[in-house]
Amino acid sequence: MELPLGSDLARLVRVWRALVDHRLKPLELTQTHWVTLHNIYHLPPGQSQIQLAKAIGIEQPSLVRTLDQLEEKGLITRHVCAHDRRAKRIMLTESAEPIIQAVNGVISHTRSEVLFGITPEQVDELALLVSRLEKNILALHENQA
């Protein structure tokens, strides 16, 4: 009997994010907000909305509402790209810095707690296996196209 690996991985991501989300409640950020801010921070500066949507794994139109909300909070700015007037570049504002630091701190601390009792070698092996799974899935998608 095969193990439900896909379901197990999806559940793991869901409960991990829920834990981080609970710990970030004092910042009054929704999960969508902190995931978006976290991704903007870790991508090279000035990414386009399309690139950000791909990094998060959502459709670009779904991202627009979240970006509107983050812009209203003064955490990001969007600028029209000089090379493609249809594209918008996203930048974090100075006021986002303390929030980003708090989010990163909670994520890092939670990661340490979640990985308690797991050796660095085991974490590396898990990361390698997950990367291989992703590569296989992407190859299957390309073969379907």
Swiss-Prot record:
Disruption phenotype: Pleiotropic, with decreased production of exoenzymes such as pectate lyase (Pel), cellulase and protease Prt. Has a 50% decrease in potato macerationafter 96 hours. Dramatically reduces transcription of carA, the antibiotic carbapenem biosynthetic gene. The keyword Acetylation does not apply. Residues 2-135 form the HTH marR-type domain. Belongs to the SlyA family. Residues 49-72 bind DNA. The gene is slyA. PROSITE patterns: HTH_MARR_1 (PS01117), HTH_MARR_2 (PS50995). InterPro entries: HTH_MarR-typ, MarR/SlyA-like, Tscrpt_reg_MarR-type_CS, Tscrpt_reg_SlyA, WH-like_DNA-bd_sf, WH_DNA-bd_sf. This is Transcriptional regulator SlyA. GO terms for molecular function: DNA binding; DNA-binding transcription factor activity. Transcription regulator that can specifically activate or repress expression of target genes. Regulates genes involved in production of antibiotic and exoenzyme virulence determinants in the phytopathogen. Required for the expression of the virulence protein evf during Drosophila melanogaster infection. Pfam families: MarR (PF01047). NCBIfam families: PRK03573.1. HAMAP family: HTH_type_SlyA. The keyword Transcription applies. GO terms for biological process: antibiotic biosynthetic process; response to stress. Keywords: Activator, Antibiotic biosynthesis, DNA-binding, Repressor, Transcription, Transcription regulation, Virulence. Homodimer.
